[in-house]
Curated annotation (Swiss-Prot):
Keyword terms: Amino-acid biosynthesis, Cytoplasm, Histidine biosynthesis, Lyase
PROSITE patterns: IGP_DEHYDRATASE_1 (PS00954), IGP_DEHYDRATASE_2 (PS00955)
Key word Amino-acid biosynthesis present: yes
Gene3D superfamilies: Imidazole glycerol phosphate dehydratase, domain 1
Domain of life of the organism encoding this protein: Bacteria
GO biological process: L-histidine biosynthetic process
Protein name stated in the entry: Imidazoleglycerol-phosphate dehydratase
EC number from the UniProt entry: 4.2.1.19
Family: Belongs to the imidazoleglycerol-phosphate dehydratase family.
Gene that encodes it: hisB
Short name of any one Pfam family annotated for the protein: IGPD
Originating organism: Rhizobium etli (strain CIAT 652)
GO cellular component, one term: cytoplasm
Pathway(s) it belongs to: Amino-acid biosynthesis; L-histidine biosynthesis; L-histidine from 5-phospho-alpha-D-ribose 1-diphosphate: step 6/9
């Protein structure tokens, strides 16, 4: 009888004086999402993250939006990162590394990931305006910093060029999504081994 593959899912509930957030992810999904953060542009970006990574995501976030969006965006990144880390488990059999150059109209952005267990963000992205609509562009970096730190991944994001700030932000999310899609995939040639000569990624 064939063995049933272990479920690669993770759920996190996080409550502080500033936010209340619940996140569930399925690494072996189809990119379905149910997202509500109260921040419209951020919801749109998270939908792109789920759809292009093929990671199913359910995200419900309530935060102190009467102050600003910062706590909600950062804490959502923390919770998604923790949920992904749970879903990865001991990271046996994963592809681990991936990178992609992603184009959108006039914009080109590169994302490279290593699901190493060692959190690090290299951010080389510049926006030409402080806001996209009402959304603070500096929060894009804050989100990815929180995601990388709590998922235990090394993440490099480089915007090669682009003129439209919406496109720059969106290519960051889409490029990271596509890199995660590849890096989290199970490589049958690994035969369940941890992809590291150290024997551990946690």
């Amino acid at each position: 009888m064939a063995e049933t593959a272990a479920s690669r899912t993770g759920s996190v509930s996080r409550k502080t004086n500033e936010t209340s957030i619940s996140v569930s992810v399925n690494l072996d999904g189809t990119g379905k999402s149910k997202i509500s953060t109260g921040v419209g542009f951020f919801d749109h970006m998270l939908d792109q993250l789920a759809r292009h990574s093929l990671i199913d995501m359910e995200i419900d976030a309530k935060g102190d939006l009467h102050i600003d969006d910062h706590h909600t965006v950062e804490d959502t990144g923390i919770a998604i990162g923790q949920a992904i880390s749970k879903a990865l488990g001991d990271r046996r059999g994963i592809t681990r590394y991936a990178s992609i150059d992603l184009a959108m109209d006039e914009t080109m952005t590169k994302a490279a990931v290593d699901l190493s267990g060692r959190p690090f963000l290299v951010w080389n992205v510049a926006f030409s305006a402080p806001k996209i609509g009402t959304f603070d562009t500096e929060l894009v970096r804050e989100f990815f910093q929180a995601l990388a730190q709590n998922a235990g991944i090394t993440l490099h994001i480089l915007n090669h060029y682009g003129a439209n700030n919406h496109h720059i932000a969106e290519t960051c999310f889409k490029a990271v999504a596509r890199a995660l899609r590849t890096a989290t995939e199970i490589d049958p040639r690994q035969a369940g081994r941890v992809p590291s000569t150290k024997g551990t990624l946690v």
